[in-house]
C-alpha cells in the first residue's frame, strides 16, 4: 500500500492544487445567484437532498472500501471515534455562537473541515478525490446561497458581501492543502485519517444536509433527489 501511495503522490499533489478551488467557484456562483434572487424553499431542499445523495455515494463507494479492505481495526476505531467527536464538538460550538459573526464562524469551520476531508479523500485515490470534490461543490453552492443572503441583510455593499463570502470559501482549499502531508505517514495512520473523514462525511449527510432539507416543505419528488444524486454518482464512478 505504501508503495502505491508513493507512486501516485505526484498526481495527488497536482490534483490537490487545482480541484479544491472548484468548490470555491461554486460558492462564488451561489453568492451571485443569491444577490440577484434567492431560490425558493422547494429548490433549496431539492439541492440539499441531491447533494446529500452524492456525498453519501462518494463516502460509501470510494472511502469506505479503502478503510474496510485494509482491516486495520484499531486505526479505524480511533479515527472514527475522533471524527464523530470532532463533528459533535463543532456542532456544540455553533449552537453557542449567535448573530452574523457566529454564522460566519460556523460556516468557516464547516468549509475548512470539508477541505480537510477532501484532502483525505485523495489518499483513497485520485478518483475518490474528484468525486468527493463534485459532491462538496453541490454542498458549498448551497452554503454560498445561505451565507450571502444572511450577510446582505446587515451589509449594504454587494461587493463587500461577495468578497467576504468568497474569502471565506478559500478556507476549503486551505484545509485540503493542510491534509496533503498525511499521505506521507505510515499506512495505519492513513487509514485512521480516512476513517475520520468517513465519519465527517456521514455526519454531514445525516445531521446537516438532510436535517436542514427536512425543515422545508417536502414532496416525493424532492425526496427522490437524494436517490437521484446517489445513483448518479455511482454511474459516474462506473464510467470513469
Task: Mark where each language-model region is.
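Intrinsically disordered, metal-sensing/regulatory segments
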Residues: 1-240
